[in-house]
């Protein structure tokens, strides 16, 4: 037990130590171009020339958003064509067939929006070709898209008055060449050294301990797993994700992969402070997010290491904690840390079965995604916080009788309306779709049966499975309570719709707020200006987030994990 807790503490310490210098590097990448990766400039110039891009052309927020949306639409059709026809494409030694149109739609939307919700198993649902030229490609592009959007927001916040927020294509390219690609190489080498496969051979046939034969999938796993983690993508190469011994073979790879999930989202908060030359603001935002993260880690580690009271009643020893759905090589401590890390971001990768977590652990995982603000996905994590920041500024200003201002710009009704829509759209999408699925389950049992029955666990936990699926989709997370049979027409299409709304509506709103504020007249700070870089304002923002986001889900949580908790304790 003590060793497991020490491992958890070590991983958190690694994140805290490395996120600060990495944040400084990221700020230099986006602001000055005078970073340690500037030797990549010739490759970047080649990409610009090949694509016909002028990286020095400034864009206003509307042109910026137009470019962002255009590239996503293009890659959607690219992915759909390849996924449906993958059975006829090269690099398919195992002879896997193409995906059905509804599954391809869900897969393509999911990876295009950085969610990586998987209604298929990677070994049989994809080929090496689509793993590389759809999945891995999307994992770089979608992560870079979020980072580019944040870079545009940072530029708008740093300028006193401007109509432009940078060049989307430039930010997209340098996010890949100077941040994501180099870090992926380092993580990939570590995985290869530890035994993760990297090749294009077909399935291996191996003898088991019982003397029978078993086939084991392999492939270019070590190339895909690093960006899966670093880009907060989360889509597993294998069906069981990082629970698989070839995707996550040792405790060291577990540390590296878990660290990779959160390091860039953490560093981007510091990067904001460095970019704006307001380090104190970065520290306050980082502190709020870190507090919420550590609170979740404490709860999950406690409940998972305490064991299941129902198993205690059977007289079974639980000195190792609640081990159902967990890998013995990792234990409940490391898997509890991972579950919180993967849900405070939009990663969604797994090293255990979330469906087997204790009820309140599952509630913490859902709350992290329902709040969707603590660090979050690369780039979009701060952007979600940004909407609540605007609301907190407005409320605080009214409470103390001051004009609401943020970084010298007046926050007025227009910005508040957009921020309110963005913050309320998330719970609206989750709760409406969960209500629809619950209605269909109760009042259309014939339809549900025609799709395989959906739920393996009716009752409180069955409701939690449906709530979790839409929560994960809307938070661009992609993890799941896998007791839900989700590869059906209903779940593929409804989750796909939730994915589209929840990805693009917030990005459009947040970039619009940044563009509108950037265009306003700058007002120098004075004694009457509301300070946004203080602990007091950080606490205010935290409670605004809890009241607006977390409490919206309390009735639904009561019907699911909270009711399940009282049924077993």
Please report, for each region that a protein language model flagged, where it lies by residue:
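A conserved hydrophobic secondary-structure block that centers on an alpha-helix together
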Residues: 126-200, 255-282
């Amino acid at each position: 037990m003590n060793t497991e807790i020490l491992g958890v503490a070590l991983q958190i310490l690694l994140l805290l130590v490395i996120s600060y210098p990495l944040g400084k590097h990221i700020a230099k990448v986006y602001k000055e171009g005078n970073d340690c990766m500037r030797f990549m400039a010739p490759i970047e110039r080649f990409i610009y020339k090949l694509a016909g891009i002028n990286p020095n052309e400034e864009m206003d927020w509307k042109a910026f958003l137009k470019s962002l949306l255009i590239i996503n639409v293009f890659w959607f059709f690219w992915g759909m064509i390849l996924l449906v026809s993958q059975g006829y494409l090269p690099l398919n030694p195992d002879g896997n067939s193409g995906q059905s149109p509804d599954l391809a739609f869900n897969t393509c939307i999911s990876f295009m929006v950085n969610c990586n919700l998987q209604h298929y198993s990677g070994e049989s649902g994809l080929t090496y070709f689509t793993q590389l030229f759809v999945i891995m490609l999307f994992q770089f592009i979608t992560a870079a898209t979020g980072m580019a959007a944040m870079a545009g927001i940072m530029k708008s916040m740093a300028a006193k008055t401007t109509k432009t927020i940078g060049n989307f294509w430039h930010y997209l390219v340098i996010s890949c060449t100077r941040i994501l690609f180099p870090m992926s190489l380092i993580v990939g080498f570590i995985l290869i050294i530890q035994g993760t496969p990297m090749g294009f051979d077909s399935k291996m046939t191996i003898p088991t301990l019982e003397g029978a034969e078993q086939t084991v999938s392999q492939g270019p796993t070590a190339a895909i797993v690093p960006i899966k983690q670093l880009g907060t993508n989360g889509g597993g190469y294998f069906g069981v994700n990082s629970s698989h011994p070839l995707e996550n073979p040792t405790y060291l790879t577990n540390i590296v992969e878990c660290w990779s999930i959160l390091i860039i989202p953490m560093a981007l908060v510091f990067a904001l402070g460095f970019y704006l030359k307001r380090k104190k603001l970065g520290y306050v935002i980082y502190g709020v997010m870190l507090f919420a993260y550590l609170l979740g880690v404490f709860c999950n580690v406690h409940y998972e290491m305490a064991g299941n009271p129902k198993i205690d009643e059977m007289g079974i020893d639980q000195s190792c904690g609640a081990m159902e759905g967990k890998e013995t090589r990792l234990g409940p401590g490391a898997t509890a840390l991972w579950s919180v890390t993967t849900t405070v971001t939009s990663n969604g990768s797994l090293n255990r079965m979330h469906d087997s977590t204790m009820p309140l652990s599952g509630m913490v995982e859902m709350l992290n995604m329902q709040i969707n603000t603590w660090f979050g996905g690369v780039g979009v994590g701060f952007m979600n916080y940004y909407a609540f920041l605007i609301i907190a500024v407005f409320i605080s200003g009214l409470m103390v009788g001051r004009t609401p201002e943020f970084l010298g710009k007046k926050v007025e009704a227009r910005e508040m309306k957009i921020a309110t829509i963005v913050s309320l759209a998330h719970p609206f999408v989750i709760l409406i779709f969960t209500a629809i699925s619950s209605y269909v389950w109760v009042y259309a049992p014939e339809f549900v049966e025609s799709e395989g029955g959906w739920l393996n666990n009716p009752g409180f936990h069955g409701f939690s499975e449906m709530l979790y699926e839409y929560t994960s989709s809307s938070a661009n997370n992609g993890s799941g309570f896998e007791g839900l049979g989700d590869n059906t027409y209903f779940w593929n299409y409804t989750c796909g719709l939730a994915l589209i709304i929840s990805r693009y509506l917030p990005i459009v709103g947040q970039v619009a707020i940044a563009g509108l504020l950037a265009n306003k007249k700058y007002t120098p700070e004075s004694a009457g200006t509301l300070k946004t870089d203080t602990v007091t304002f950080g606490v205010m923002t935290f409670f605004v987030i809890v009241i607006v986001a977390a409490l919206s889900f309390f009735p639904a949580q009561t019907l699911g994990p909270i009711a399940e908790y009282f049924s077993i304790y």
